[in-house]
Amino acid sequence: MTLDSQPCEDQIRALVRGLDKAAIKKDDYAYYPEGGGSHSFSFLRSTNCWANTAEAKSDHEGSEGATTFYQAYQMRGLAMWAARSGDKQALELAGKLARYVMKPRFWGNAADPPHVVGNEQGHVDSHFHARMAALRGLLEYGIVAGDTRACDFVRSSYEYIRSYGINRIGFTPYLYDRNSPAMESCMLGDFLALTVKMSRAGIGDYWDDADRIIRNQMAERQITDINLLERLSQNAPKTAVPESQPGQISTENVHERMLGIFASITMPTCSISGVTMQCCTGNAARGIAYAWDGIIDGQGDEVSVNLLLNRASKWLDVDSYLPYEGKVVIRNKTANRISVRIPVWVDRSKLQASVNGAGRKLSWVGAYVVFSDMKPGDKLQLDFPVVEETVRLSAKTGEKEHTTYTITFRGNTVVDISPRNESPDVYPMYLRDHMKTAKKAPMKKVRRFVSDKPVLQW
């Protein structure tokens, strides 16, 4: 959609008016009730509007047990539209929803120490995907409206959520029932959206978090091996699936059709469920796009490289040899000034840079090394040792139990992890022996498309 498309713009403004009419308004806030239906998103089930307009008493209400979830997408969509159109009604409604979502009764964790006021800092105790969807809506509104309180709330809540699990590999349990030790893949998209947007907005520097997620849990949760998938299917417990609609169940080429989807419920080293919810594929796949978009930021003749991942763009191309080699080649097209963010694990004293083979002195601005007076066609190369490190980190694997994992990293990339679940009824992850032994990055020739227009507006 473009804003010069009048029919689309008229329809969106009508949608905003409809959302405003449907919202329950009180004082300076507004909300959409759960509705009393049989599904989490029981919006406007009849022409008489809501069956039940009662205001929620906690965040654990509704079939998803997540009151703030039911405001999340409306809040984000309204704020995004306001940013693009200047629609004051949309921004005002987003603000009212934000004030409802941030009410202290929806936040907090009883396990917090007495002196920690967790319900004012976005602390949570359940359903992290639903909470982060609400945080995404709050963040969008906070950035568009310049609401520092909303942005600060999101930052605090994000940092609290990532303290669960093993943040360094991008694993965080989703706590659907407040005791679940597994992670839902929907959260991968949430995490990448929050890390990229907060970093760009200057709310914090979370690029290393994004790098760890995309290189590890995101890459490993995508189902790509049909043999492992068939093994899981043959050994997993058999359950009867009721057919609610004619033709709803299909048994044709199921494994082949599943390749590329994202596993729903996983532990740090494997997928543990023979069932996949397709919400996870939709949300996780968008996370890939968020990370891809975040690799490069360009404006005029100034470009920032935020993530050392492969990316072609109209400004420059990034060729990353990580994790095999400590080498990144940037082929300049139009930039005069290139800023490259260096990951936290790189030893800055051993970082070297050259332009067209000639050494360059390093000039730092925070975590970025800056190169000025670049010319079209210049080849900028960064070289540094790849640090291999083995650490022991723990994650909850039962209602009370924790498992300590021995994890070997090359930079931010996991190349080995143990103990593993060797059961044939799981889909194993981190089968990365090739990353442990290879000293040269594998190469292949591909054709890449570069758009001259913005690809994403999210």
Task: Tell me what each language-model feature is.
Residues 1, 37-72, 106-140, 144-147, ...:
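Solvent-exposed loop and edge beta-strand segments that line ligand/cofactor-binding
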Residues 1-62, 66, 77-78, 82-85, ...:
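N-terminal catalytic cores of secreted or lumenal carbohydrate-active enzymes
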Residues 1-7, 72-88, 133-147, 189-203, ...:
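Well-ordered alpha-helical scaffold segments within catalytic/enzyme domains
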Residues 11-29, 92-112, 149-170, 212-223:
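Long, well-ordered core segments of solenoidal/helical folds
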Residues 94, 154, 207-223, 227-235, ...:
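C-terminal beta-rich recognition modules with glycine/proline-rich loops and embedded aromatic residues
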Residues 143-163, 179-226:
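Catalytic-core region of carbohydrate-active enzymes that cleave or remodel glycosidic bonds
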Residues 335-355:
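Beta-strand-rich binding/interaction modules
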Residues 348-373, 390-397:
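Solvent-exposed beta-strand/loop surfaces of large extracellular or lumenal domains
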